[in-house]
Amino acid sequence: MHNRYIFATSALLVLAGTLRWSHALAEASAENVAELEEIVITAQKRTEKLQDVPVSAMVVSAQALANANVADLSDLNNLVPSVQLNGTINGRVPTGIRGISSVSNEQTVGISSGVAINIDGVPVPSDSFAANNVAGIQNIEVLLGPQSTLGGRTAASGLINLTTRGPSDTLQGFATTTLTRDDEHRFEIFLSGPLSDRVEGSLSAYKSTTRYPITNLATGDKTTQDVAGGRGKLLFKVTDDLDVTLMAHSELTQGHGFNFVYSYITPGHDLLFTAPPAFEPPFLTPAILLPGITPSSNNLDYASPVTSAGASHRDADFSLTIEDRLGGGYTLASTTAFQQEKQAQTQDLFAVDNFFWNSLTGNNVHIPGHPLAPFFNTQSQVSTVKQLSEELKLVSPTDLPFSWLAGAFYSDTNVDETYIRSLPPAGLDVHVVPDTKTYDLYARSTWKFAPATSLVTGLRFNHDAISYTYDERTNVVRFGVPGLPDIIEGPFFSSGSSSGNTVVGDVGLKQQFADNVMGYVTYSRGYSPAAYNTSAVLYSNAALDPVGKESIDSVEIGTKGTYFNRTLTFNADIFDTRYTDYQIQSYANAPGVITPPLDLSSVGKAETRGAELSTEWLATSTTRLNLSAAYIDAKFVDYMGAPCYGLQTAAQGCVTPANGSPSQDVSGDTMPNSPKFKATLGVEQRIPLGSHPYELVFGGTYSYRTSAQMLPDQNPFAIQSGFGLLNLSAALQSSDGKYSARFFVNNVTNRHYFTDVEDFWSGPWNGNALIGQPARDSVRYAGLKLTASF
């Protein structure tokens, strides 16, 4: 292990030195007429050049987002190899970096996935859907690996910062529209400019309809998502040194239909077939419940009589930023932000083409005084997510021998959720309100103690206070048929609170080998805070015990360089990150359990290690290539007591203690949804049309990933084979880039794949039942994008 990393470190340093000399020779022998653009990032609390920051990071520009036809945040999967986003139209977007993610389902509230997501530096609540849409985004910055020192409590495995377009001192803007053959359409407009001598403004508006390749065979409808919103900013230049920026954002996202389809059901198994033989009619068989559907990894269909399935998310966000340039290059800045999202969601509980419970009981279910019967296959969730945050920071100039920044951060995140499952055999009516407060102090410094050597250190003190109230108004098992007695639990009420302090930090050494070539080594200490499993089912009024916090130790060694007269960038790193008391969510599947509980547990240890690289080459003034790749080995080091998958036998490792649930030991097994290798290759070729003020632009990207186990229980039917996605485009645009018409084809080879797989319906099928979520681009589609700017 250690020898492997010594060798890798030496290889990186030798490579950096070799490229340094190549860089010098190229400068001495050639003069290029084109250079790569300088990329800056703001995710570390100040504006910095990407190539100067001693951390593994990638930036996806607005142009790259447009060229890749990125529709939502989950499309980062195909652009940043170390990122894995499940994507969903019905709730939160579980996010992982380097194979690490804690959240598996949007039902759980108040818990972070381990990846901090910010918009213009303001943290987005983990339960919010607000960051899923990328309309109005200038670029996306991705910091890989633990970022707890500056990212805070939610950045255990990384940080994603979306920067939005803002005001300008000249009038500018653009309008763009996208149409596809499968009836997707998008429209976006942006305007920016001066309103007076000391006031500048910007306004963006967008609207889209996306039809996913998922069909409800019972109705013929496609799963669809509609988005409409806008963002406005006002910049007041109060004095030459004092700026005040106001931001308001509103968005409505509405999803229609279901986003999962069956990928596997154990042959010969029927829904609820554990009921007495007299209640096993043929309409509980897959042939009747799933007409015309063959569960498989290529399935794109479901069948449901539920027409109300879908979700809506209404966002209203506001921020006030005050920036005071104090003189001498020092800046004092304050950002106050309020975010609110109202969510409503209705799901088809088992996604079958029959109101099976009503048919089973002859529509005669009657529960006196109870509003949950008869059952029409739905469960619903209504939530309001609110967050108030304040950040105050003081930043020194960067050109000092000792530069630094220091700040204080406060946030209060509250989620108010009502969850109703009206299935009489497992009815549930819950109102849960978790609240999370954090009080933080942080500092980061860079000491250039030698002409080419700097020491980078950081420290953060966090005080986390978590609390909840849990009102379980109904928890029943009611069959409504003769001979089957009702089982009634509750009502129950529980509440609790917990708080704790944590100190995290990092220390690193940065070595400048040449003006444009540097190497670094960094040790980081991070954490994920304690949390309550508010998706648990109560069986008493006792307070829940919080799941303990997670601690993280990470080492990263890397190099960054710009070569050949700024026509080539090459960045590479290796990393090793250890997680102790790792937090993970999983469903406790067991035969006959209709609705398995979602468990949040703190397992022993987990680890991710590997290597990453990203490079871009401006081969000529009209030819550009880029390559990014990641090899990631993410696994459970110590995870005993993991849930078993459906029908897992003792010979396959599933054991059932005398007084416990079936469990297994998955120590040494892979993390869920973490391919060992991912890579993306992109190319762009511009062809000027002689004396005409236009040019042709041809582009393509190929993204490849190896096979991946999609579930922590290591279900053998949840392995997705490796695949590649090829996207091609051709455009006619003006030479100044102001006007363009681009034709594109995504997923040229028509390779179907899932972004998520779950097996929590194994219990009701009393076997092994899996559902998968097809990606938007899991079938080939073509489109046209028109853009005009000024």
Model-derived features: positions:
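Membrane-embedded beta-barrel scaffold of Gram-negative outer-membrane proteins
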Residues: 319-349, 512-530, 546-618, 624, ...
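Gram-negative outer-membrane beta-barrel transporters
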Residues: 455, 576-578, 601-710, 787-789
